[in-house]
Amino acid sequence: MNHFKIIVPLYNVQDWVKKCVKSIQLQTYSNYECYLVDDISTDSSREIIKSLIQDDERFVLIENTEKKFALRNIYEAIEHSGDNPEDVIVTLDGDDWFATKKALEILNEVYLENRCFMTYGSYIEFPSMKRGPFCKQIPHDVVKGSTYRQSKWFSSHLRTFKRHLWERIEVSDLKNGDEFFRMTWDMAFMFPMLEMSGPLAIHIDKMLYSYNRQNPLNDDKVNHRLQLLTERHIREKNKYEQDFVIADILGPSGNLSGIGNQLFCVATALGYAYEHSATPIFPQIRTDRFINMFKDTFYKNLNVGREGDFSTAFHQEPFFEFQKIKHTRGALKIRGYFQSYKYFENHRNKILDSLNIHELKNGIKEKYGDYSDFVSIHVRRGDYLHLSQYHYNLQMDYYNNAIEHFGKDSKFLIFSNDIDWCKQEFNSLKNVQFSENKDDWEDIILMSTCRDNVIANSSFSWWGAWLNTNNSKTVIAPSRWFGPAYSNKSIKDLIPEDWITNV
């Protein structure tokens, strides 16, 4: 659920402000606050507003004592509204109104689905009731080249953005000298935010906004020449440079559907992003069914953004060998297996936060109990039995040696895609349990809550061990990972140095 902060600058709007306020109060989505900023109106705007919001705690009326104009009013209202970086700011002029009572509901769905930074959209003009001329999606080549300031103006009402994006704008870029721009305020903050958002700026085609053409105080009517001069000045401001890394989670073959393989690519993109202050984007979370199934668990906190290839550079990883990814300005697309902790180990805590691990662990413990004194054992059979040319089938000697390492009286929790076979092979253990009938993400997280881990030659249990945050954990991993077809592949970059491979 998103929390919206609706900012409404207004001046002498007595003929329309009731329609504006009512359109907010009638929203079907109620998780919002509204800040109305009256810029010393000389008509009855304030009195009308006070009568409408007197019993509604979600509304705040800010009454200026000096003339500040719209952009400064928006800036100060946002500063006044709190400091949660995930709040969604919505700008609505006091002489305009929401075109539908489901506007916030639709916005909430868009932000949840796309994990975007900002939205722009479509509006209907009043009183003609015609679609506005700027209701268009920004062209792909403009987004890719970040040439917003050199292009036609597209990003129109309804404009919304995450607060963390707003906080990255330099105040000087909202000003002409010492004063905030008095006109064309939308361009002043939209250009920087579009440049910083790239594919994370989403166009909404549905009509959410009613733009009032009747107001004689509209900028283009009051001083069209000053409006054009201000627009030129804003376009000449310095461009905001932002790097992006776009992950092709499905890998070189296009079928890395397993969660273990996915996580290597995701973590690598996150590691690159943290290393170079880039913005990571994962559009396949929305479009691919094998990735989408984890959108509410591991990928809950990740950016999705627009579809399409917006990359200006491409990095293809060599199979199973660590190769540092060169920093690239602009948008970099990465594709590969990336099966090495070296891509992201330096940012471990941030990776854990990004993958929602702490919340997931708490949920698993609450659902299945506390296994913090157990040793997890993962046995990979199933598909490996038919692909032994590529994947080595671990023998029971490996598991017996691992059990001896911990002692047979230890508590063991066994995970496998062939539990029936495991129940026969491990039936001599005194304290053993088997994980059954769980989702893949649940098994990985449950492994990570165990005290120690015995993994298979599988990215699935590799992640169960890596996500284990027990500082004194022991992880036992096989020294042989591949079958004869891949005998030339090394795992030197795959297994962390403190894991044991010689049992």
Model-based region annotation:
Residues M1-Q242:
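Nucleotide-sugar donor-binding/catalytic module of glycosyltransferases
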Residues S253-F264:
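A short, glycine/small-residue-rich beta-strand->loop->alpha-helix junction that serves as a flexible
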Residues F264-A273:
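Histidine-anchored nucleotide/phosphate-binding helix
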Residues G483-V503:
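Leloir-type glycosyltransferase catalytic cores
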